[in-house]
Amino acid sequence: MKTAIIQLPGLNRDQDMLVALHHITGVEPIKIWQTESTIPDVDVIVIPGGFSYGDYLRCGAIGARTPVLQAVREKAQKGVTVIGICNGFQILLEARLLPGALMRNTSLKFVCREIKLEVVNANTRFSRYYSKGQIIRCPVAHHDGNYFVDNETLKQMEDNEQIVFRYAENTNPNGSIRDIAGIINKAGNILGMMPHPENFIEPAHSGTDGRLLFQSALELTNG
């Protein structure tokens, strides 16, 4: 299985993602720099977390307007699987590849801790190896993770089952509407989420709850 990791100035979780994907697939991901206007044939494209371009203007605003993001858009339109984690999620929202926006945490503080997620929709290419209602552990590390969307769009998302993960058991770290932690687009091939599943893929690193997300996306057997 071939994977690609998008690299932008200020993204600092690319190495974490590379280690995770390499560990799961046995194949080292391709790194795609910001100035690239094409992306080779791959099965999954990942935009990792960090602080692209120093979060100037808005988190993800500059990153969403780079040549490589246009290439990501073109691949996504062809049905290629795309995952945006944390700042990657912010970039996907700024690029209008996903609905809604991410605002400053209601605490006005950077939040870095382990939280619990509820699997809301287990019938997606990202969650098929989980069970609906399953509670999983995952870390968060962000300052602007407060997801917001207007009521009309929220209803459409709920009707379309686009909400994949929610913060569970009063663990919402940022004030996100309806405790939303991860969503997909209508076509179901783009996932954006604030938590970092790439950090929970080995038992020695606090657990393996994040591993199934990548195995699901890559259609790898659960094992």
Swiss-Prot record:
UniProt keyword list: ATP-binding, Cytoplasm, Glutamine amidotransferase, Hydrolase, Ligase, Nucleotide-binding, Purine biosynthesis
Catalytic activity: N(2)-formyl-N(1)-(5-phospho-beta-D-ribosyl)glycinamide + L-glutamine + ATP + H2O = 2-formamido-N(1)-(5-O-phospho-beta-D-ribosyl)acetamidine + L-glutamate + ADP + phosphate + H(+); L-glutamine + H2O = L-glutamate + NH4(+)
CC annotations in GO: cytoplasm
One Pfam match: GATase_5
GO BP terms in the entry: 'de novo' IMP biosynthetic process
Pathway, per record: Purine metabolism; IMP biosynthesis via de novo pathway; 5-amino-1-(5-phospho-D-ribosyl)imidazole from N(2)-formyl-N(1)-(5-phospho-D-ribosyl)glycinamide: step 1/2
Enzyme active site: C86, H196, E198
Regions annotated as coiled coil: none
Record domain Glutamine amidotransferase type-1: where: 2-223
One example GO MF annotation: phosphoribosylformylglycinamidine synthase activity
Keyword Hydrolase: yes
Signal sequence annotation: none
Localization of this protein: Cytoplasm
Subunit annotation: Part of the FGAM synthase complex composed of 1 PurL, 1 PurQ and 2 PurS subunits.
HAMAP family registered for this protein in UniProt: PurQ
Role: Part of the phosphoribosylformylglycinamidine synthase complex involved in the purines biosynthetic pathway. Catalyzes the ATP-dependent conversion of formylglycinamide ribonucleotide (FGAR) and glutamine to yield formylglycinamidine ribonucleotide (FGAM) and glutamate. The FGAM synthase complex is composed of three subunits. PurQ produces an ammonia molecule by converting glutamine to glutamate. PurL transfers the ammonia molecule to FGAR to form FGAM in an ATP-dependent manner.
Name by which UniProt lists this protein: Phosphoribosylformylglycinamidine synthase subunit PurQ
Organism listed in the record: Bartonella quintana (strain Toulouse)
